[in-house]
Amino acid sequence: MSQGEIVQVIGPVVDVKFSIGKDLPDINNALKVIKSDDDSIILEVILEQGDGVLRCIAMESTDGLRRGMKVEDTGSSISVPVGPDTLGRVFNVLGQPIDGGPEFPADHPRSGIHKEAPKYDELTTSREILETGIKVIDLLEPYLRGGKVGLFGGAGVGKTTIIQELIHNIAQEHNGISVFTGVGERTREGNDLYFEMKASGVLDKTAMVFGQMNEPPGARMRVALTGLTIAEYFRDVEGQDVLLFIDNIFRFTQAGSEVSALLGRIPSAVGYQPTLATEMGQLQERITSTKKGSITSIQAVYVPADDYTDPAPATTFAYLDATTNLERSLVEQGIYPAVDPLESTSSALDPEIVGQEHYDVATRVQHILQRYRELQDIISVLGMDELSDEEKLIVARARRIQFFLSQNFFVAEVFTSVPGSYVPIKETIKGFKMILDGHLDDLPEDAFRGVGPIEDVLKKALKMGVTPSDPEAKALLEK
């Protein structure tokens, strides 16, 4: 393998000079800097400067690097362990275990993190719904098995909590394989998630990859590809349906932006890298379903300053089948999950996919919530007394629907001391249909807040001293 030496170090960016006339390492190749007999760091070739100089990005801290240090070409891109043995383990961007478990032997199957997306004739689409057990998602923006989902929201509105609940519900109910990729998020959250999954017994069906906030931008740029490579193996070789969770895709963009100027690129809109769309496309086009197996991807997307026109979230929108938008005003009202039922969308909300009854109930819910939003302006200026009887009924039912869209989470039980609930789609449809048809008009609004199926509402109302008068509600309570 060819050898070079360091000629310049600028933060995470390292320039390496190789002898002119010899074969230069390819773009995306991994280079190894030998710091001492038992210490080395990995660089990745990003671009060629001319005169045998390659500009590289470090996957680890560049502390201790100096000019003149020897650099070896590994001859290939960064490669990470793949296969069933990765389940139950935690890795860094280089595929090295960071959970204190045994190292993988040199002859263990590995795969390079840079690959081409599957060809067009290999792709397939699914029309099967992935049940999540979260009412607002299953009813209004159902997720497709093998689809791509984005959880959009500003800081502190609950993106990571929803991702953790989805991992819990899907692992418990669907018995599937998951890959969780932490991209530039808090180390504490990754630590909590690891021990939570260990305690609930789902860790042995999950591979975890972390490149957290404190790591160099090179690691945060590439860690999403590491997680995706592990997921691709289960799809392409094992022929399985895999769930890929990425938290947070914005940090992937942010890391690229951090090194873009150091690489000599002129910034684009809002200071982002000019290659933003290309980088996002290279990642997203690989996250897809083929005739061999599927990858269902659920990605948290941080929205800077709650501005959805920011180039980072706006670029992500184009690749998604469903979007779950989290709204700060709902957090302020104490409605969790704080999913905006009118702004969230899904291509699967189609009578041919979800069935006519589900579609009808969902559109009726959206209609009544939209009408309530329009009436709020009148209410804020003139008060409820100026509304007609029909409008008052719409407001009353809309508020019950809004509260019933909230739900207690299993992963939040440790904070709230209230048990979580998993609600099957059939139960969700039944509950909202009863509210829409007026069977629960005499129950207090608070009975609908933070509950699971509609039976929980009736039990909560009883505890509040209210017995339903509607025959259908009474019959359900007696069951």
Curated annotation (Swiss-Prot):
InterPro entries: AAA+_ATPase, ATP-synt_VA_C, ATP_synth_F1_bsu, ATPase_a/bsu_AS, ATPase_alpha/beta_chains, ATPase_F1/V1/A1_a/bsu_N, ATPase_F1/V1/A1_a/bsu_N_sf, ATPase_F1/V1/A1_a/bsu_nucl-bd. SMART domains: AAA. Its EC number is 7.1.2.2. SUPFAM superfamilies: C-terminal domain of alpha and beta subunits of F1 ATP synthase, N-terminal domain of alpha and beta subunits of F1 ATP synthase, P-loop containing nucleoside triphosphate hydrolases. PROSITE patterns: ATPASE_ALPHA_BETA. The keyword ATP-binding applies. Belongs to the ATPase alpha/beta chains family. This is ATP synthase subunit beta. It comes from Lactobacillus delbrueckii subsp. bulgaricus (strain ATCC BAA-365 / Lb-18).
